[in-house]
């Protein structure tokens, strides 16, 4: 059979076996030949040493499975299999008496499945009217009262039939277990199955009916009565839904683990005197639970993980004018040409990056170099093909043999599991690929692979390529005194923003997975499929990472098959009173201990404490905290690109329908003449008040000036530039100069700006060059030699401030020069943070004593809440000076903006709308907030043009 020709990727030279399973490391076995490996039954685990193989789980097949490729395992209904790795989700790695391979998880069920009386429908119905008859029929109690009177009892440690009430909602009482120390020393993390810890239960020698010995001082009759009274089976209701059984079980069972979250329970209504008190307690519990993802606690909630986005995806609807759909946070996009569909019709495109590729795409002769993309179309009446553009995570070897032996191909299928067929019309430039997709289907699956030509065993495609894999660190949204981080390895560069993680505590029923957030990631070259060790270190002694220095292992066969591997690292704070964010160092080592990759990640902050105090960022950094500034992962790994002054070609054009000449001049509102042509940066509209009422506006470019034009006065004609378009051509340099006009009118706090730049700028040299200090040595900025890169960045910033405040002929604006420099090195994320802080502070200063009126327009704040914002700033006599009114206003705006969300555009837009609603709005005299709104809405087109790596001819296939 073809599977017998698979060579082993293990460096110890294991003999070939009958499937891919030779890559499993059997530690402690004298001869690692699979022909001599015993079947791992529960009895053998009792007799032999269970510490080395304690994660093996026995399952039984519920239907036949015939594989269609050599990496999967054939089995028949009723056959017993032994699962070695179940972290793959849909596919588990298992073996029978002779072979190893992947099996579909839906075709098998755990051997202790009969412990659960739940039906597939999620309901338990059809119960008899006579309760005693139902008990007799289901044999739930059996002869358990006699079992207490028997003197001969025995203890079972790993019999799956002796795991009581945790998996059976009809039996009440927690599972009392003791965990061996060996459980924490296991270096390989198999996430789904729990280590076979001994469970102390008392059972009859002649029957499989058992009762957990939780009441040693209670007589058997009292125990039986208590269980019968509390048992949900003996209620009058005929049927129970799965959610009701979960509630009944949660009420009857005690805590199953001794973690930090053991006391974090959902409040019960009977604990409170009023409905409002219960509602407040429930909301606080929900807020805490959602911010501190404890896997043991939240895993018991079947609805939590299912409501979170996991795989990166986007859905967009386009009309006949075409456009582009880009997958968020990736280099993957679909270009839709104009007239792709008929005029008046639309095309809805769904694009999703799948985490795990099909098994048939990864073997000795082929390996995936991009995620599998799922493309869904709503309209099949199309007139032209689509263009898929993506970046591959591989580079061919430099020698000529690599170019002849291996080729980069695009495969396509109508089903996720295949079969996949090659796509002929592809075009490559560097690591970017463009694929022409014709013969469109409603659902398509596309993937890029490196495929060998003429490769014979023992060679593999890995010897001719440099494949890159991505390691990402995931954790909760807010850190906690005790939480868990997860390291995940992906076979491509599309690490999702959120990741589902499974971990079973002592529960036998499968809990829902927990969603964690991406903290940081890095890509590195993996020379060959091999066992890699992932280590995690903390930079503060107050935080201890369990098994972080020893690391955890990802097996080579998982990397070869492109499977996503998830390793869990518990992290504990030694002193919860000193809880703060810290830095984690991720290290990846090869099989010989050499470092393949390492990078640092700054953790998020703890959950803010509730109270009247502002939850926004502090305006000033304490002096003792200046030495604790740590560069963010973005600043460490970022390579700053070069700003290119080139024409902006993505404009749309419109015909002006009306002549407008303004009596009260506004530098950000255009004046124009009927019949002329105007360029539009985009068709997105901005809402703000005109002379009398709110209107919608386009950002337009007219005769060398950028500003707003009323949307009703423009007829959009398309992307083709008319020949009679007047005025200078819009370039990125001119666009940058135009959008930065309002910056010099914004107020800032220098200490806050200095802190942000020290945390996010990784190279003082690049920063200085962008400011115009090219080729100047470090001594020009500081008198003494500075060792820290953050201090060097601060010295460059200090020099800029001195020159801007000096009385020179050409006085510079500190804010404008700083924002311009940051945009030239593509620090848009840092720019929008600074702009938002500047806008909020400037608004607070401009509004001052009228901030209460603004708060009513924005959030309808009560008088008590307003007093709470002003209380910290009053003097001993309870008075608040008029010159200090900006402080409570700033505190309120920080809190309000945090509630709006992370969209800086929404924050500034809603702030402008709220100011327009005030009596005698300050936007009548202070017009620069309108300019700031133009600035933040023009950043995307500026960045896409100034830092584009595409040549004009590269855009066409």
Curated annotation (Swiss-Prot):
Originating organism: Xenopus laevis
What protein name is recorded for this chain?
SH3 domain-binding protein 4-A
The taxonomic lineage of its organism, from the top, reads: Eukaryota, Metazoa, Chordata, Craniata, Vertebrata
The terms under GO molecular function for this entry are:
GDP-dissociation inhibitor activity
Instruction: Name one process (GO BP) from the record.
Output: cellular response to amino acid stimulus
Annotated ranges, domain SH3: 54-113, 649-719
Whether Repeat counts among this entry's keywords is: yes
Please report the stretch or stretches of sequence annotated as the ZU5 domain.
Answer: 312-449
Q: Which SMART domains match?
A: SH3 (SM00326)
As recorded in Swiss-Prot or TrEMBL, the protein's gene is named: sh3bp4-a
Which keywords has UniProt assigned to this entry?
A: Coated pit, Cytoplasmic vesicle, Endocytosis, Membrane, Nucleus, Repeat, SH3 domain
Q: Does the keyword Protease apply?
A: no
- Cellular localization per UniProt: Membrane, Clathrin-coated pit; Cytoplasmic vesicle, Clathrin-coated vesicle; Nucleus
What UniProt notes about the protein's domains is: The SH3 domain mediates localization to the clathrin-coated pits and vesicles.
As for what it does, the entry says: Possible role in regulating endocytosis of the transferrin receptor at the plasma membrane. Alternatively, may function as a negative regulator of the amino acid-induced TOR signaling by inhibiting the formation of active Rag GTPase complexes. Preferentially binds inactive Rag GTPase complexes and prevents their interaction with the mTORC1 complex inhibiting its relocalization to lysosomes and its activation. Thereby, may indirectly regulate cell growth, proliferation and autophagy.
Q: Which Gene3D superfamilies match?
A: 2.60.220.30, SH3 Domains (2.30.30.40)
Assembly and partners are described as:
Homodimer or homooligomer.
Where is this protein primarily located?
A: membrane
- GO cellular component, as recorded: clathrin-coated pit; clathrin-coated vesicle; cytoplasm; nucleus
